[in-house]
Amino acid sequence: MNLEETMPLVFERSIPGRIGFSLPESDVPETNAGDYFDQAYIRSIPADLPELSELEIMRHYTNLSNHNFGVDSGFYPLGSCTMKYNPKINEKVARFPGFANIHPNQPESSVQGALELLYDLQTSLVEITGMDEVTLQPAAGAHGEWTGLMLIRAFHEKNGDTKRTKVIIPDSAHGTNPASAAVAGFDVVTVKSNEKGLVDVADLKKVVGEDTAALMLTNPNTLGLFEKDIVEMAEIVHEAGGKLYYDGANLNAIMAKVRPGDMGFDVVHLNLHKTFTGPHGGGGPGSGPIGVKKELIPFLPTPVLTKKEDIYTFDYNYPDSIGRVKPYYGNFGINVRAYTYIRTMGPDGLKLVTEYAVLNANYMMRKLQEAYDLPFDQVCKHEFVLSGNRQKKLGVRTVDIAKRLLDHNFHPPTVYFPLIVGEAIMIEPTETESKETLDSFIDTMLKIAKEAEENPEIVQEAPHSTYVKRLDETRAARKPILRYQKEV
């Protein structure tokens, strides 16, 4: 079945003159828009908006929604994305009238409850990360990365250390790391991984110098491996005058067990939409708070939420601040959900999250290594990386395996990342999945590996049961069609 044949665009369903709404007669005089707006802003021809009945609109979008795939409908082992289940109590709390119906322009005195929640969330994140202060202002992970790097840049500039223009990043890092560093005005230097998949400390010593602003690390790293030499690496960077930046993408692997601040990190960003169950992957906005050690507090974006006696207030008196990085104070709704999750789980619950996430990943890794190559054969944390090189020799690529999983109602893992692993298959099961679900996925992966040996065509031509078959993904990325244009 071809989606283009069975489901036209809403514009293509349009019938001129068909009405899907009812408005009362206007009780005010008609006016000419040209009397109020410059002609440059007034359309010369009407907007080509779709004209449908309410029923047609309802059916169109309901049918579209039935083709969506999310964590509520199936297993979503997308490596490095922590696609865990989002508890619905989060949604209930976020819809409390005192949270849902307030406006950011209200006086502080009228939203003390909301400010108390944000302050308590900051305090919780300080404890979880081992930092000294947290701001909730950044909107998402990469935004948090950039904000943290801007703080580091401001710190060095305040100290007259303008020669520190380089940020060191491992060759296994998330792609956002070098991008954030570049946008923040830094040059990127790559440090190699060793044969165990960890940062090569000897190579780090070579690239660290007087021009080092920071080292950006994820721990555990993007291979799902814990950087056991982190304390030594922190000492190397600090002795050179640089700062240590923690990418919190993989906090789910160590939460409530160890703290980045205790490892020597100076700046941390978190992904509340991942680790702390805000909906993501198309389900809503993110939230990327950053935590800092004491000497970086003066540079935090303003305003800074503080508590004076029993009153919660925004403090703008930070003369060295990098300024605002987002209107108002972060994505409030996601912060409410994260706070609800933390309070629901408690310290012991957060420890169990980490333990189950690590257990699930190691269970799957050991079950799958018989059929797929395992580049780094050691205990992993919350995720692991396989290689499809064995299947590639049979004519089946990793992308084929990913497409074949769609036929079994599984979202594919992350593929071809990290870049240092050929035909990479990156799997993160999270803590919320049952053993039965894990076993079903394992059985499917083993079945696909067998198909690659005995009937490779069925894998090469997958998917077979989806509404859309193989798309030209390269063309879609390089020549996207972002708006509808009627054929004349």
Curated annotation (Swiss-Prot):
Residues where N6-(pyridoxal phosphate)lysine is found: K274
- InterPro entries in the record: GcvPB, GDC-P_C, GDC-P_N, GDC_P, PyrdxlP-dep_Trfase, PyrdxlP-dep_Trfase_major, PyrdxlP-dep_Trfase_small
**Keywords (A to Z) from UniProt:** Oxidoreductase, Pyridoxal phosphate
Give the required cofactors: pyridoxal 5'-phosphate
Q: Which GO terms describe its molecular function?
A: glycine binding; glycine dehydrogenase (decarboxylating) activity; pyridoxal phosphate binding
Cellular component, GO, one term: glycine cleavage complex
- EC primary class: oxidoreductase
Catalytic activity, EC: 1.4.4.2
Record CDD domains? GDC-P
What Gene3D superfamilies does UniProt report for this protein, alphabetically? 6.20.440.10, Aspartate Aminotransferase, domain 1 (3.90.1150.10), Type I PLP-dependent aspartate aminotransferase-like (Major domain) (3.40.640.10)
User: What reaction is this protein's catalytic activity?
Assistant: N(6)-[(R)-lipoyl]-L-lysyl-[glycine-cleavage complex H protein] + glycine + H(+) = N(6)-[(R)-S(8)-aminomethyldihydrolipoyl]-L-lysyl-[glycine-cleavage complex H protein] + CO2
UniProt keyword Oxidoreductase present? yes
Any one biological process term the GO annotation gives? glycine decarboxylation via glycine cleavage system
Could you tell me which SUPFAM superfamilies the record lists for this protein? PLP-dependent transferases
> What's the subunit arrangement here?
The glycine cleavage system is composed of four proteins: P, T, L and H. In this organism, the P 'protein' is a heterodimer of two subunits.
Family stated for the protein in its record: Belongs to the GcvP family. C-terminal subunit subfamily.
Q: Which PANTHER family match?
A: GLYCINE DEHYDROGENASE (DECARBOXYLATING), MITOCHONDRIAL, GLYCINE DEHYDROGENASE, DECARBOXYLATING
What task does this protein carry out? The glycine cleavage system catalyzes the degradation of glycine. The P protein binds the alpha-amino group of glycine through its pyridoxal phosphate cofactor; CO(2) is released and the remaining methylamine moiety is then transferred to the lipoamide cofactor of the H protein.
Question: This protein is called what?
Answer: Probable glycine dehydrogenase (decarboxylating) subunit 2
User: Could you tell me which species this protein originates from?
Assistant: Listeria monocytogenes serovar 1/2a (strain ATCC BAA-679 / EGD-e)
